[in-house]
Amino acid sequence: GIKKWVIFALNEESVLGGVRATEQLHIPAADVIGVGINGAGEAFAEFQKKEQTGFFGTIAVSSTNHGKESAANLVEWIKTGKQPPADTQTTGKLMVRGNWQEVRKELGI
């Protein structure tokens, strides 16, 4: 049988659904690594639990930075006619139980 589980999704809610399912199946948290993307309240609540769960972390992104970059691209497009690239990628930072408060502060979330 499967001994180690990886749960990945594009948000914390989906990952937490998988984590809760492993808990119901009595799979130890040490055998589960759940990672989401966003860096929102669901992750913060999980990090504050007394016992570590299978929710390992999230890739935190700053919606403020997304908005600033999008607005700057739009203004440049309007002013100069320079169309933004079709694929604009952003960066994120791994937020885990041990650094979540520092990452929140760093990213302004």
Feature locations, PLM:
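Short, charged, surface-exposed secondary-structure boundary motifs
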Residues: 43-47, 67-70
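Short, conserved active-site loop motifs that form the nucleotide-linked donor/cofactor pocket
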Residues: 32, 55-57, 92
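Short beta-strand elements at the ligand-binding edges of bilobed clamshell
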Residues: 49-64
